[in-house]
């Protein structure tokens, strides 16, 4: 099973991706995670990527396709994979097609912008472990402190209000066009891929079940 997970920043793609990965025993390929690892490396490329993300812009198609191509060639992708964060542009989608990356399902997690802004700006992260909190929806026991270690929580530099609005603007201007691209592709291609739209403004478990229901009946 090969799945592309679409949705704006903060729509819950990462959470659902991990659940789908475990449910269907497929590899979760998150370009966001791979980019953050590159940034943590301290290399020149990582520094350049950080500047791009801090400005609320998208990483180049060339870089994204390169890391995805390398990743899907690994053995753990033989049973299938889920792409989280790619493609974000039509050129990326076209490049994946040229590489012969056949997709079975496109799942869009749909959430309104005002809710996305609230979700993202309230996020707090424990850098060492990656544990994630939210000031409203999942607050730590002590404000701005990790529940396990008591260490300070941080806000990602790209999670501030202005940057979030810019990211959503970029999403709607570029990434959202993929919805139409794949919807049209699905309507004219009887084989693959199949387009599925899911209401993301629900409990995590309900979103997951809606996704499973759609995948299992096709």
Curated annotation (Swiss-Prot):
Pathway: Purine metabolism; AMP biosynthesis via salvage pathway; AMP from ADP: step 1/1
Biological process annotations from GO: AMP salvage
Binding site for AMP: 31, 36, 57-59, 92, 156, 167
GO molecular function, one term: ATP binding
The keyword Transferase is assigned to this record: yes
Location(s) in or outside the cell: Cytoplasm
Disulfide bonds: none
Assembly description: Monomer.
Protein name: Adenylate kinase
Gene designation: adk
């Amino acid at each position: 099973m090969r799945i592309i997970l679409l949705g704006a920043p903060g729509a819950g793609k990462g959470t659902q991706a991990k659940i789908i990965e475990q449910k269907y025993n497929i590899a979760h390929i998150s370009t966001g995670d791979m980019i953050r690892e590159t940034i943590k490396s301290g290399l020149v490329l990582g520094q350049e990527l950080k500047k791009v993300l801090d400005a609320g812009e998208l990483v180049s198609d060339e870089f994204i396709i390169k890391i995805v191509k390398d990743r899907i060639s690994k053995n753990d992708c033989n049973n299938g994979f889920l792409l989280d964060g790619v493609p974000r542009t039509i050129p990326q989608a076209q490049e994946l097609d040229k590489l012969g990356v056949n997709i079975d399902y496109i799942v869009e997690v749909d959430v309104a912008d005002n809710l996305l802004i609230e979700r993202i700006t309230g996020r707090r992260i424990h850098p060492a472990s990656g544990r994630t909190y939210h000031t409203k929806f999942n607050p730590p026991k002590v404000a701005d402190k990790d529940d396990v270690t008591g260490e300070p929580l941080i806000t990602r530099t790209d999670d501030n209000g202005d940057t979030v609005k810019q990211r959503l603007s970029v999403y709607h201007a570029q990434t959202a066009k993929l919805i139409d691209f794949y919807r049209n592709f699905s309507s004219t291609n009887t084989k693959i891929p199949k387009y599925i739209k899911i209401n993301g403004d629900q409990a995590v478990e309900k979103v997951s079940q809606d996704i499973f229901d759609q995948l299992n009946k096709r």
